[in-house]
């Protein structure tokens, strides 16, 4: 934290140099300006705010000082737009451009997002990235963990030392991400999140009443942090509905870069005709935007063939290749290529793609309209020779007495002869796995959560993007579907959830998974239970006190809790207890008294910084300190 407020530092500069002259001095890195700051009585604060260390050398950060000065005057801050939202380029709003960034109110802020339950609709706290840089650094420092629990066989200490351990963390997900990012940076293969959709209602168990700009800031902060977790070949899937999906896509273009966009998957999530609560179109789908950390290194895995009844034919290779189906070698819809339009002589017969010699001759002589008669073979001459040699080709007469060449498409062998289950390239359309299925599953587990995602949907996503033992992250863990599916599919996982139901729903669900519950994808994967996860919570400080104040039943109880606080908890140095003792305060209703007491507490200290864990005031026991040391080592 700065000992001197930024406003004081800026006022000293503008008083000494004048505002107009100061801008020129900053742009030219004038020696007089640098000497003034470095020899000032608040030199350390000037260094912390407007200089940075590069290769052990103190370097003047002109941009930081300029931005801070300009924001002080409210001339160039994004917040000047207030309620305007649009696409922004080269200093102004635009309708279209090759290069765009999403512009929205409070873009240069960090939104804490401290919802704890559905019933509390609190005003969310913004921190400005420039004017509150030090405050941001403080609340995004590593936080101490507490209430460690081991679930499954084994002991907690060894689990914390094991890099393959699964984790379920309770706490604000933005702060948790920043606490965990150094430990898990560049290790996560797949991130899946199902954030609040900004629907303006309580259709599921989130404090889902952000306004548009708040929601965008909320997502921006978390996506920027999440990107640091992804491995170079990692991918992120973000689920959304029509309320924000278009803005979310452009926001993700900015954070992950447009060239790393993979797909916008459509999931038909409702059975039957969909919801009819719109006067225009029925809604029965949601979106899942997928981006890669580096698209050049990312592999999207194919889906296993489900319609195996089509594979009816058998030959001498069945034990290794499995059964097969026949697929005609020629095609009229793949686009004509002259080198793939050649005559084939087999078993005393000559074959032409499309079956017509005259059309073939016209194609060769340039007389045919290729778009009408663009037949050709799917395999080259060399590939055909390989297929004949390795028994991948079959000639067969159809019911009309016509002979055709077919390739054998085996169930357990690819077209290059590699023995492995056949897969299909996944489609960006999922027309299965409804919310009805997931709601039924949740009820079977005797858990109370609305609109949990079906396990089969998350199974598809993890099949697209991961292999066994890959690490999966979900920082909107909700009812724990992602963690449960990862557990059953032998993936490692980290789940983060700040809502209080993590203890009664999310954690309880994962305990049932370890016990071997048979809903969802359990039977498909032959899952019988087992495995472990570690539960822990970010250590609350002011959050715990705020909760006590909120739950107080009387004004006297509220004041008693507040008055026992050490002065370190107070948000402002000029906040005086005697003002709370005033008659004016006493005349306020209880809820207003609670609000004033809670807002007087510094949100920087909602959670305990790891660096402060040894201070006696926090009364952290030695075993908890030890577990933190092991976890963060």
For each feature predicted by the language model, list its residue ranges.
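Extended, Lys/Arg-rich, non-catalytic nucleic-acid recognition/anchoring regions
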Residues: 1-18
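Coupling/switch/interface segments within P-loop NTPase motor domains and analogous charged loops
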Residues: 12, 19-135, 379-386, 390-402, ...
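Class I S-adenosyl-L-methionine
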Residues: 72-471, 503
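Glycine-rich SAM-binding Motif I of class I
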Residues: 200, 480-484
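Hydrophobic/aromatic ligand-binding patch that stacks against planar heteroaromatic rings
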Residues: 228, 484-485
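Cysteine-dependent PTP/DSP-like catalytic domain, specifically the C-terminal lobe
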Residues: 267-276, 460-469, 488-548
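Charged, amphipathic alpha-helical linkers/stalks
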Residues: 536, 544-583
């Amino acid at each position: 934290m700065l000992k001197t407020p930024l406003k004081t530092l800026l006022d000293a500069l503008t008083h000494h140099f004048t505002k107009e002259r100061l801008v020129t001095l900053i742009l030219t890195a004038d020696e007089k300006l640098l000497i003034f700051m470095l020899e000032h009585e608040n030199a350390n604060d000037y260094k912390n705010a407007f200089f940075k260390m590069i290769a052990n050398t103190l370097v003047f950060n002109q941009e930081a000082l300029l931005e801070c000065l300009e924001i002080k005057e409210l001339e160039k801050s994004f917040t000047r737009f207030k309620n305007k939202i649009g696409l922004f380029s080269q200093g102004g709003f635009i309708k279209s451009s090759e290069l765009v960034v999403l512009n929205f109110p409070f873009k240069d802020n960090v939104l804490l997002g401290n919802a704890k339950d559905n019933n509390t609709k609190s005003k969310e706290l913004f921190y400005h990235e420039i004017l509150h840089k030090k405050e941001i650094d403080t609340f995004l420092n590593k936080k101490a963990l507490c209430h460690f629990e081991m679930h499954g066989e084994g002991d907690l200490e060894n689990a914390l030392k094991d890099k393959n351990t699964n984790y379920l963390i309770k706490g604000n997900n933005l702060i948790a991400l920043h606490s965990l990012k150094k430990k898990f940076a560049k290790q996560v293969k797949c991130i899946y999140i199902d954030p609040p959709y900004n629907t303006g209602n309580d259709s599921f168990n989130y404090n889902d009443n952000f306004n548009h700009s708040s929601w965008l800031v909320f997502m921006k902060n978390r996506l920027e942090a999440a990107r640091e977790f992804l491995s170079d070949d990692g991918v992120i899937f973000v689920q959304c509905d029509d309320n924000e999906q278009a803005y979310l896509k452009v926001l993700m273009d900015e954070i992950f870069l447009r060239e790393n966009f993979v797909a916008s998957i459509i999931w038909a999530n409702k059975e039957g005709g969909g919801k009819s609560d719109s006067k225009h179109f029925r809604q029965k789908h949601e979106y899942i935007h997928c981006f890669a950390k580096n698209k050049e290194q990312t592999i999207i895995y194919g889906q296993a063939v489900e319609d195996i009844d089509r594979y009816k034919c058998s030959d001498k290779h069945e034990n290794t290749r499995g059964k097969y189906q026949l697929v005609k070698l020629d095609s009229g819809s793949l686009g004509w290529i002259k080198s793939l339009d050649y005559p084939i002589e087999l078993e005393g017969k000559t074959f032409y793609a499309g079956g017509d010699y005259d059309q073939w001759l016209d194609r060769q002589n340039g007389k045919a309209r290729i778009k009408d008669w663009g037949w050709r073979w799917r395999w080259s001459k060399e590939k055909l020779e390989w297929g004949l040699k390795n028994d991948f080709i079959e000639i067969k007469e159809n019911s009309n007495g016509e002979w055709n060449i077919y390739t054998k498409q085996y169930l357990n062998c690819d077209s290059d002869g590699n023995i492995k289950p056949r897969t299909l390239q996944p489609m960006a359309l999922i027309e299965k796995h409804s919310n009805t299925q997931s709601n039924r599953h949740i009820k079977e587990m005797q858990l109370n959560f609305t609109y949990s995602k079906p396990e089969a949907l998350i199974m598809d996503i993890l099949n697209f993007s991961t292999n066994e033992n890959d690490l999966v992250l979900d920082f909107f863990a909700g009812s724990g579907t992602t963690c449960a599916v990862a557990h059953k599919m032998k993936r490692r996982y980290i789940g983060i959830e700040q809502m209080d139901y993590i203890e009664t729903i999310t954690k309880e669900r994962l305990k049932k998974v370890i016990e071997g519950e048979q809903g969802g994808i359990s039977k498909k994967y032959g899952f019988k239970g087992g495995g472990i996860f570690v539960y822990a919570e970010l250590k609350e400080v002011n959050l715990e006190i705020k909760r006590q104040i909120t739950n107080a039943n009387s004004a006297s109880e509220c004041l008693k809790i507040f008055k026992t606080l050490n002065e370190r908890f107070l948000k402002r140095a000029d906040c005086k207890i005697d003002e709370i003792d005033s008659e004016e305060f006493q005349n306020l209703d209880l809820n207003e008294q609670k609000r004033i007491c809670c807002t007087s507490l510094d949100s920087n200290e909602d959670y305990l910084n790891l660096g402060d864990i040894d201070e006696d005031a926090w009364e952290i026991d030695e075993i908890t300190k030890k577990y933190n040391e092991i976890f963060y080592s």
